[in-house]
Amino acid sequence: MSLGTTDIASETGDDSLSAITFESDIESKTKRKSFHKPPSTSPKSPYYSKPRKVTSWRSLKTAGSMPLSSRMSLTPQKLWLGSSKQGSVAQPPSPTLTSEHAWTHPPSCTPDYLTEAVRAKRADLRRSGSHGHVSGTSVYREKEDMYDEIIELKKSLHMQKSDVDLMRTKLRRLEEENSRKDRQIEQLLDPSRGPDFVRTLAEKKPDTGWVITGLKQRIFRLEQQCKEKDNTINKLQTDMKTTNLEEMRIAMETYYEEIHRLQTLLASSEATGKKPMVEKKLGVKRQKKMSSALLNLTRSVQELTEENQSLKEDLDRMLSNSPTISKIKGYGDWSKPRLLRRIAELEKKVSSSESPKQSTSELVNPNPLVRSPSNISVQKQPKGDQSPEDLPKVAPCEEQEHLQGTVKSLREELGALQEQLLEKDLEMKQLLQSKIDLEKELETAREGEKGRQEQEQALREEVEALTKKCQELEEAKREEKNSFVAVTHEAHPELHAPSPCSRHSEPDSDNSAGEEGSSQPPAPCSEERREAAIRTLQAQWKAHRRKKREAALDEAATVLQAAFRGHLARSKLVRSKVPDSRSPSLPGLLSPLNQSSPAPRVLSPISPAEENPTQEEAVIVIQSILRGYLAQARFIASCCREIAASSQRETVSLTPSGSASPPSLRASPGVIRKELCASEELRETSASEPAPSVPYSAQGGHGDCPSSSSLEAVPSMKDAMCEERSSSPRSAGPSLAEPSPPELQPLSPPPVEDICSDDSDDIIFSPFLPRKKSPSPF
């Protein structure tokens, strides 16, 4: 299609150019026809004499000397015309030749009047020659003129042939374009092609003419389709099978009335010849009355049927919506006589209640046009033979009043039943809503109970696991302490010169070396110093063990105290949210502390009604406290192992050097160690002294702490446990003194408070004591 469009564009361009040239050719052609005439038949042939070609060659010569621009615009025909046809009647073909007229006519010496006379003569001769040769008159023409005319005719013939060729080419192009356009029109009119093809053609064509033609074709097709649809609709409307039953009924009624009217007219027209005019008038009046009565009756019947239909619909709706449908449903199974009897009974009841109304209604004359079901059959009978006296007997008023009364009673019953139904529906909706609310509350209560049970179970399992871990850690701690005591007990007899005091013993060793050269010290002095050093070591070791145990017990008591405070705060919070819950009992909580396990198992007697963030926060606080305590216990155990291993290495490394030292040098470190250990004991007691009470805000982060009366049992329990634990090092004191000499057995170790040291700058190695745990940020 793109090639076709380019071809069409090129062809349209060529046609435009050819059309311009064609118009110019037509203009020149018409101009040539105005002065080119067929040659006159002369008796003398112009070919007997030789023509003179001076002027023609002169004109050609002058044309050759012309510039190129003017030469392109001149044709040989114009040159010949300008050179030889100076006396012709025709004017120059274009205004451009006026400028050429000056050089195509060379100047001559003949006067103007002679040239004008010659021109007039030649014009007369040509006019006479054009009308035909007249016998007896001779036409004289010069050979030069005849020759010029022949040349002009040949030139014109040649141009005509070129014009014919050009027209043939144009004709061929136009035929091709017409055939192509015919094909495109056939494609556009093809119904198998969709509108997309037309759109593509319109888009590819540069001009809007194709779009307009395509849209016109589309409009034409749409109009044809609309006409077809209208024809089908008209056929369906006129078809008998598609008409409405109500319309058919109305049409039949009108047809029946028209037939009846025509019958009456026919009967009246037949009886006109026999009856007088008075009877005719009476018959016409009676016919009018009958027709009006018939119309009124048909209208009344139609209204009654509509009312009956609406009442039936209301009754069906009432029966379907009423709750007492089980009672009324039996009427549907009754037979027609039974229903009629029931209606008669109801009518009697209504008539008994409305007896005064009936007496007044009987006095009134019945209307002949009363609406009653018995009038339905009247319209189907011919009314020609009926008289106006028979009409009042058609519809009794009594039956109509009975029916109206029954209808009123039924409507009242319907209203009452509908009100009852609405009340019952409202009650049922309220009951259903309350049932749904109760079910939701029950479901939430069940879910809360289930979650509470699961939480209690998880807390119990976690508490059991934590107590087991605490027991295991306490046992491991005891074993490590026992092993450390055994190692130190084995290492005491060999500790003659401890390494931490080596720098203090250096000057003593120098002094002793100086004294050794002069005189030897007495033996009893060295033995006394050794005994004093042994007693100092025993006292320091016992004090260290007692402090270590007290620090561990204080730490455990602090942790338990914080846990109990968190538990009491949590129970207080739960008690404030659940008023009917029982208050926690502190003796029940503290009873497991009297057992042997260091970390008692505390079970919460109060189960919260529902999970809340404060309860979870309290549980997290207790868990963090217990985990911190376990981590501290592990760290203390690892430190004890390292201290035991380092003490064993020191005793092994110091045993040979200590045995080689003299007695005087062995006794001096004992005194120094006694003083240094006393200062270390004072520092450790000040550092490891536990706080009497840890605020609950530091442990759990809550502001409401339990009262002091509820926590009195915790310090007392702590003191009792400390006394039980402190009794073990007192009993272990003599066992540590067993490796000492027998004369030192009755000596009792001095109290820690009596040992004092003025030298606080000296540093000795002492076993590691656990730091006091800082208050937990939880």
From Swiss-Prot:
It is found in: Cell projection, Cilium membrane. Residues 739-752 have a biased composition (Pro residues). SUPFAM superfamilies: P-loop containing nucleoside triphosphate hydrolases. Residues 37-49, 352-362, 581-598 have a biased composition (Low complexity). Residues 83-101, 651-662 have a biased composition (Polar residues). It is a peripheral membrane protein. Residues 672-686 have a biased composition (Basic and acidic residues). Transmembrane segments: none annotated. GO terms for cellular component: ciliary membrane; cytoplasmic side of plasma membrane; mitochondrion; plasma membrane protein complex. InterPro entries: CellDiv_DevSignal_Domain, IQ_motif_EF-hand-BS, P-loop_NTPase. GO terms for biological process: limb morphogenesis; positive regulation of transcription by RNA polymerase II; protein localization to motile cilium; regulation of smoothened signaling pathway. Residues 1-71, 83-108, 348-392, 443-462, 474-529, 573-612, 651-778 are annotated as: Disordered. Residues 553-582, 615-644 form the IQ domain. Keywords: Cell membrane, Cell projection, Coiled coil, Membrane, Phosphoprotein, Repeat. Its main location: membrane. Residues 157-323, 398-486 form a coiled coil. The modification Phosphoserine is found at S322, S661. PANTHER family: IQ DOMAIN-CONTAINING PROTEIN E, MYOSIN MOTOR DOMAIN-CONTAINING PROTEIN. Component of the EvC complex that positively regulates ciliary Hedgehog (Hh) signaling. Required for proper limb morphogenesis. Component of the EvC complex composed of EFCAB7, IQCE, EVC2 and EVC; built from two subcomplexes, EVC2:EVC and EFCAB7:IQCE. Interacts (via N-terminus) with EFCAB7 (via EF-hands 1 and 2); this interaction anchors the EVC-EVC2 complex in a signaling microdomain at the base of cilia and stimulates the Hedgehog (Hh) pathway. Interacts with EVC2 (via N-terminal end). Interacts with EVC. This is IQ domain-containing protein E. The gene is Iqce.
